[in-house]
């Protein structure tokens, strides 16, 4: 037990001075580092690796702070707790930044060459990759920095290569032409996670396709007239009576004069537009599925640069099916070479001239945008590498259905299951250079060789094809492929390591809802496939962060918050963390951030600091250890605060166990600020408290800051180090043991009644306009004067002069204290009488209104409920005012 000398504490708590000093102390001591220890139960979290291009934002605060809280909590429980950090190479995001920088120099990645380009990318990573780590340290995050990994580390790259090769050898990786998300600016495919929908104003164009036999045909509705040049059918719902007579017949595309069939497909929504939709399989995901069901040809008329092109065939098609489509090239020449949106204008103008444009209506639509370049995504057919996911998805789905994998909140398990039930093959190749290059080589005849390295590839090529002349595929793997291996690759897999043996599976994964399918499901699929175990037992889904008005934060709305600029400098890391978590609720997936919670948290730290200064300045000094006096020596106030402390510690423990961080923060604030500082600290100033207060104050503070430490690590450490304590740091201190916190429910109830009476007296002081400096004169039943500490506490907390009177019914809670003050009771009596008359009138009016059956029947439910609420409030005010008048006496 360390007992500090009586310290000279600063008058104010300064996070800007304390937090960097204590964090440096933690780093120097190595307290965040762990080794696998089979003697202790593991608690491990693999940090979702942030992008090296990223800056810390509020989303990081809501996602990573809970991970730090959980790790600190489980470490204090004595578990082998470790939080494993790392960073993601963020292939497309990083490449976008680098290409932009090269453009300023008049260069491209091609002019630089692959090797020189990658060398520059690594230099860029070394220069800027540390920014996110620095931000995390300023937020007080304590992962095991010695174990930090990067998704392009040699060991992780070896794991990625092994998984690709094994999946290929098992027949689950293949090369094929499929519809993909194409970013014309990044010149790469994108995963669904890298595509963001944004609402935009556009038009719905109604275009007439005449019947092949010269009839009226039908009118289709589309928001993308530029792709109609690749239409191969018009689809209608099979039950739509308007078009049943046309099913199986042909209509003719205007301008290019090509006949296409009318087909029936249940995917068509009869209520959308005209109920007839153009089918362009090479440029729309739904159309692609329709095209596959009906075996339609799939010509492409937009190239990889986003420009209209003569029909392109990205797969083998029969000459007979190609011929009529290829023949239209001459008639569409006026549009070829133009950007797709410029071509749209020209096509619409031409349709208008030809009389084929029937209508043009304003329409609000969702456009798919690249999250990296903000370019509009173009669905395109492309030859890419894919994973056949269904054999991997089924075990992952069964793990959830069996209860082996759980989600908090539970509803997100359904999101996970729905994604796996409707899963499609996974496009894993990207046309970028920064990333894990595909372990794929091609012979001069385009035969495929998949191998772990070039030497193996050449050996295989010689054995199979008699030559080792090879060229490597320039593409890299989807970032989510390497991220899917994260929980086991960072533990040394495929090697059998102590870390892998003891720390896999992890206990929890903390992430956001938007990547449940894209990342969580892939970690589960690959973990089960290659390690034979789930990667984690629980997935905790954090809320998305919005502004106070429920709007997404963005620069354009001028509501974006940078915690490193806008929060930490003002409120400190503790205030920022506490403020964020206080607003986090399991029942809501919208965290509508209100900065006032951070300000309140900072003031809370100041409140605790002042309580510490008071405790350390007690004339009787502090005990040599954080131990309590004998029970018989404890006062009523002591017993009350210990009972409340135990309840607080129990609530916080259950909250941490259940990921209810907002509940934990509420309980800590309620106890620390109001129960402890506002009531107990003040109560210790009463006569009769001197003998025990130092020990109780020290014990309560020591216990409380340990319970609060996971959320607010710095102020709790500073307080803990000032008090008598065991160990070198609160980081490794033990979690409060409920068995060591005594509880006195009966005595606590008595003191709770005293607090109720003091609050009544404080309200009376305000009502009667008694100045804070003036003493109140209070009469209490004579029976109270014999109960230890009650009268003295009332006198101290209410600033009252106490006298007694005969009477009372023997119950502290039920006794009414007769109060005499220094106010002008005549004027008060007149004021209360007028207020009672007004309130009686309002009650009568409201009762009459609610008794009117016509009002109740015709008014909305909200209006009736509001009137009932007003009536209840009037009644409460009336009772309170009558009680205040009665308290004045005769």
Regions found by a protein language model. Name each.
Residues 2-239, 280-316, 344, 351-396, ...:
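N-terminal, positively charged nucleic-acid-binding surface of large information/translation enzymes
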Residues 59-71, 78, 87-88, 156-159, ...:
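Structured ligand/cofactor/substrate-binding pocket environments in proteins
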Residues 722-890:
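C-terminal low-complexity, glycine/proline- and small-hydrophobic-enriched intrinsically disordered tails
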Residues 127, 136, 603-616, 636-647, ...:
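Core structural elements
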Residues 26, 155-187, 194-196, 208-210, ...:
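Gly/Pro-rich turn-and-neighbor structural signature
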Residues 88, 180, 184, 190-196, ...:
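Acidic, turn-prone loop/beta-hairpin segments
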Residues 369-373, 545-549, 553-634, 724-726, ...:
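Catalytic adenosine-cofactor/nucleotide-binding cores of aminoacyl-tRNA synthetases and other
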Residues 4-9, 48-56, 114-118, 143-150, ...:
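Glycine- and acidic
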């Amino acid at each position: 037990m360390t007992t500090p000398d009586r310290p000279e504490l600063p008058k104010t708590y300064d996070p800007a001075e304390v937090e960097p000093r204590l964090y440096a102390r933690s780093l120097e001591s190595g307290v965040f580092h762990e080794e696998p220890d089979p003697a202790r139960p593991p608690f491990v979290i693999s940090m979702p690796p942030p992008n090296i291009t990223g800056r810390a934002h509020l989303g990081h605060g809501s996602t990573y702070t809970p991970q730090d809280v959980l790790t600190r909590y489980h470490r204090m429980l004595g578990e082998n707790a470790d939080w494993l950090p790392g960073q993601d190479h963020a292939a497309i995001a990083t490449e976008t930044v680098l290409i932009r920088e090269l453009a300023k120099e008049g260069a491209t990645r091609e002019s630089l060459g692959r090797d020189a380009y990658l060398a520059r990318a690594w230099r860029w990573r070394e220069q800027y990759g540390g920014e996110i780590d620095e931000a995390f340290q300023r937020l007080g995050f304590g992962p095991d920095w010695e174990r930090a990994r990067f998704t392009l580390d040699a060991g992780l790259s070896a794991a990625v290569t092994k998984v690709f090769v094994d999946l290929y050898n098992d027949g689950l990786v293949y090369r094929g032409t499929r519809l993909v998300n194409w970013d014309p600016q990044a010149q790469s495919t994108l995963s669904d996670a890298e595509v963001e929908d944004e609402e935009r104003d556009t038009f719905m164009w109604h275009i007439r396709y005449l019947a092949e036999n010269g009839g009226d045909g039908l009118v289709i509705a589309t928001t993308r007239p530029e792709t109609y040049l690749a239409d191969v059918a018009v689809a209608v719902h099979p039950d739509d009576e308007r078009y049943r007579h046309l099913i199986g017949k042909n209509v003719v595309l205007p301008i290019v004069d090509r006949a296409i069939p009318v087909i029936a497909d249940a995917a068509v929504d009869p209520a959308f537009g005209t109920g007839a939709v153009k089918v362009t399989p090479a440029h729309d995901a739904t159309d692609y599925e329709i095209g596959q069901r009906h075996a339609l040809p799939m010509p492409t008329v937009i190239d990889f640069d986003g420009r209209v092109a003569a029909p392109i065939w990205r797969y083998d098609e029969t000459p007979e099916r190609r011929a009529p489509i290829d023949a239209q090239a001459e008639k569409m020449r006026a549009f070829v070479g133009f950007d797709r949106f410029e071509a749209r204008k020209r096509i619409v103008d031409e349709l208008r001239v030809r009389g084929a444009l029937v209508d043009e209506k304003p329409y609000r639509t969702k456009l798919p945008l690249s999250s990296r370049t903000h370019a509009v995504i173009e669905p395109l057919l492309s030859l890419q590498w894919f994973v056949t996911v269904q054999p991997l998805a089924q075990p992952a789905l069964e793990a959830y259905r069996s209860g082996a994998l759980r989600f908090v909140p539970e509803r997100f398990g359904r999101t996970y299951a729905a994604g796996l039930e409707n899963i499609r093959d996974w496009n894993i190749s990207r046309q970028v250079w920064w990333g894990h290059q595909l372990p794929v080589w091609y012979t001069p005849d385009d035969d495929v060789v998949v191998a772990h390295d070039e030497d193996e590839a050449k050996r295989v090529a010689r054995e199979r094809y008699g030559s080792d002349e090879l060229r490597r595929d320039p593409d890299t793997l989807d970032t989510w492929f390497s991220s899917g291996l994260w929980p086991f690759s960072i533990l040394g897999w495929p090697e059998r390591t102590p870390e892998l043996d003891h720390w896999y599976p992890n206990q929890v994964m903390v992430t956001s809802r938007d990547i449940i399918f894209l990342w969580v499901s892939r970690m589960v699929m690959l973990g089960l496939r290659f390690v034979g175990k789930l990667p984690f037992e629980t997935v905790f889904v954090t809320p998305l962060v919005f502004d106070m008005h429920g709007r997404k934060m963005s620069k354009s709305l001028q509501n974006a918050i940078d915690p490193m600029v806008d929060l930490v400098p003002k409120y400190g890391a503790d205030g920022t963390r506490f403020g964020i978590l206080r607003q986090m609720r399991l029942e809501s997936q919208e965290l509508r951030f209100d900065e006032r919670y951070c300000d309140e948290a900072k003031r809370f730290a100041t409140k605790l600091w002042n309580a510490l200064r008071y405790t350390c300045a007690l004339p009787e000094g502090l005990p040599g250890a954080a131990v309590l006096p004998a029970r018989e020596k404890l006062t009523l106030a002591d017993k009350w605060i210990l009972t409340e402390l135990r309840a607080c510690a129990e609530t916080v423990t259950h909250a941490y166990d259940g990921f209810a961080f907002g509940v934990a923060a509420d309980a800590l604030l309620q106890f620390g600020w109001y129960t402890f500082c506002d009531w107990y600290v003040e109560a210790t100033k009463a006569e009769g408290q001197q003998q025990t207060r130092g020990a109780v104050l020290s014990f309560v503070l020591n216990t409380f800051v340990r319970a609060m430490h996971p959320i607010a690590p710095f102020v709790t450490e500073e307080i803990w180090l000032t008090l008598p304590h065991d160990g070198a740091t609160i980081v490794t201190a033990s979690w409060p043991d409920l068995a060591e916190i005594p509880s006195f429910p009966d005595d606590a109830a008595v003191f709770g009644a005293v607090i109720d009476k003091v609050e009544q007296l404080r309200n009376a002081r305000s009502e009667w306009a008694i100045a804070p400096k003036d003493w109140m004169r209070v009469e209490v039943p004579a029976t109270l004067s014999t109960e230890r500490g009650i009268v003295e506490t009332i006198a101290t907390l209410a600033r009252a002069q106490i006298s007694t009177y005969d009477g009372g019914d023997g119950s502290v809670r039920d006794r009414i204290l007769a109060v005499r003050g220094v106010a002008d009771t005549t004027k008060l009596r007149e004021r209360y009488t007028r207020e009672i008359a007004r309130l009686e009138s309002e009650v009568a009016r409201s009762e009459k209104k609610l008794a009117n059956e016509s009002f109740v029947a015709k008014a909305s439910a909200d209006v009736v409920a509001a009137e009932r609420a007003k009536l209840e409030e009037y009644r409460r005010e009336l009772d309170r005012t009558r009680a205040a008048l009665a308290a004045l006496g005769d």
